[in-house]
Regions:
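Walker B catalytic acidic pair
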Residues: 17
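Conserved catalytic/coupling modules of large nucleotide/cofactor-utilizing molecular machines
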Residues: 20, 27-259
Length: 259
């Protein structure tokens, strides 16, 4: 790691399974007849995990250069139980968590990272970078999309009980826009030339178009137009397809969707 940072490189290390390592640590601890802690894991599990993750970060080298090491650790708790010791201690020492969701994987929604269980504590640190390198509105747009997804989660509890037909049109619109966010923005096709790697500028333009559709649709609903009429010209499906239809090097085409 140190030789990599001295050569002024940015390196990422992926740990395939912290859980298996912790289980091996538990077995060795048992054979050494050490005092077990929660669920049989050794009492020093937390310190071992912290010693590993604390090796990540930016390096100020003696030769005046800079390098960095990023660590991504995979935790596989038994039965998806996030309360077990390995998961809990890992979350103590990291500031970002990607929660993989089995239902999303079965639905072929990749990456199968659930947007409500996942989080990043780096958002505040990165806000100046987004403001200077992408747009001052980037974080605000991101927060608005997350608010819509949270509203969808609350509304889905009602939909499961009594169906979506009984919802008022403004709430139906929220569900429709959330679907656009999930399929048109979050879902990714790694085998598609335009979608396999999307620049930040395009991601921002996609968020802007989705929110533009939301505001214009909400204005029409406030004037009495039902959501069913808005859906007749497949405008929502067209917005879902912009990730494929707009090339990564032709972002000026987004203006066509504002007309």
């Amino acid at each position: 790691l140190h030789s990599t940072s001295r050569r002024q490189r940015q390196m990422c290390i992926r740990d395939s399974s912290t859980s298996r390592w912790a289980e091996a640590l538990r077995e060795l601890s048992g054979r050494l007849e050490e005092m077990p802690a929660e669920e049989g894991f050794p009492a020093y599990l937390a310190s071992k995990l912290s010693a590993f993750y604390e090796r990540a970060g930016m390096m100020q080298n003696l030769n005046g250069t800079e390098g960095s090491v990023s660590i991504i650790g995979a935790v596989s708790p038994q039965g998806g139980d996030f309360s077990e010791p390995v998961t809990q201690n890992t979350k103590r020492f990291v500031r970002c968590f990607w929660g993989l969701d089995k239902a999303l994987a079965y639905a072929r929604h990749f990456p199968a990272i659930h947007w409500l269980t996942s989080y990043s504590e780096y958002l505040e640190d990165l806000t100046p970078w987004y403001r200077d390198h992408v747009s001052p509105k980037f974080v605000a747009d991101r927060n608005q999309l997350m608010a819509i997804l949270n509203q969808e989660s609350s509304l889905m509890e009602i939909v499961k009980l009594i169906g979506s037909d009984v919802l008022p049109d403004d709430q139906k619109l929220t569900l429709e826009i959330a679907r656009v966010i999930r399929l048109g923005f979050l879902q990714q096709n790694a085998f598609h030339q335009e979608d396999t790697c999307v620049p930040m500028e395009k991601q921002f333009e996609m968020m802007e178009i989705i929110l533009y559709l939301y505001e214009k649709s909400k204005a029409l609903i406030n004037r009495g137009m039902p959501v069913s009429v808005l859906k007749e010209d497949n405008i929502f499906e067209r917005i879902i397809s912009i990730k494929y239809d707009v090339p990564n090097n032709q972002l000026d085409k987004f203006e066509q969707y504002r007309k």
